Swiss-Prot record:
The lineage of its organism: Eukaryota, Metazoa, Chordata, Craniata, Vertebrata. This is 14-3-3-like protein. Adapter protein implicated in the regulation of a large spectrum of both general and specialized signaling pathways. Binds to a large number of partners, usually by recognition of a phosphoserine or phosphothreonine motif. Binding generally results in the modulation of the activity of the binding partner. Disulfide bonds: none annotated. InterPro entries: 14-3-3 (IPR000308), 14-3-3_CS (IPR023409), 14-3-3_dom_sf (IPR036815), 14-3-3_domain (IPR023410).
Length: 235
């Protein structure tokens, strides 16, 4: 898996880490991060493609042939994206969440569950969208409650969860006030306890705090109604 990462062959890396996960033992922190990086890159490529193709599809209105080609290609990418998300969610439900012992592992995997349901909801419609949105919110909320009671406000996993949960509120639920409130609370609580940061996680934590602040600036700016690429990070 490490070799695949160095070669940037993320599909191979994901397949390796899926096989490791299916052995059924609790993953080490390093294995957990390799799994996360692999699937984040695999699904990220499809999410980017889907956005580009959807934009092209909208621009080809009035040109039936080109629009049909764009729609068929979008549906192909959509199926790939859905299959990847379902793979990850299956691993989370069957192995990762049930086997997670430390609170930080439980939060990490529940956050991941929220993320992959969120990715599904981006391409879903109708009842399917409602279900994926509800599942995403439920996973994020459960992770959020554990993180508040069991982890320091400066912990990079807790901060990463707050970042992605706030993006969920902004992009998926269209609730800018809730998104800003959540991001601001996470940032302010971390700032107050900055002196508790250990050297090991200082870089990760401060990077996510910067992303939280960037999103807050973007969301509260005068241009908040305009389409903008929201900064989003996973840890």
């Amino acid at each position: 898996a490490k070799l695949s990462e160095q070669a940037e062959r993320y599909d191979d890396m994901a397949a390796s880490m899926k096989a490791v996960t299916e052995l059924g033992a609790e993953l080490s922190n390093e294995e957990r991060n390799l799994l996360s990086v692999a699937y984040k890159n695999v699904v990220g490529a499809r999410r980017s493609s889907w956005r580009v193709i959807s934009s092209i599809e909208q621009k080809t209105e009035g040109n039936d042939k080109r629009q049909q080609m764009a729609r068929e290609y979008r549906e192909k990418v959509e199926t790939e994206l859905q299959d990847i998300c379902k793979d990850v969610l299956d691993l989370l439900d069957r192995f990762l969440v049930p086997n997670a012992t430390p609170p930080e592992s439980k939060v990490f995997y529940l956050k991941m569950k929220g993320d992959y349901y969120r990715y599904l909801s981006e391409v879903a419609s109708g009842d399917s969208k409602q279900e994926t949105v509800a599942s995403s919110q439920q996973a994020y909320q459960e992770a959020f409650e554990i993180s508040k009671s069991e982890m320091q406000p400066t912990h990079p996993i807790r901060l990463g969860l707050a970042l992605n949960f706030s993006v969920f509120y902004y992009e998926i639920l269209n609730s800018p006030e809730k998104a800003c409130s959540l991001a601001k609370s996470a940032f302010d609580e971390a700032i107050r306890e900055l002196d508790t940061l250990n050297e090991e996680s200082y870089k990760d934590s401060t990077l996510i705090m910067q992303l939280l602040r960037d999103n807050l600036t973007l969301w509260t700016s005068e241009n908040q109604g305009e389409e903008a690429d929201n900064v989003e990070g996973d840890n």
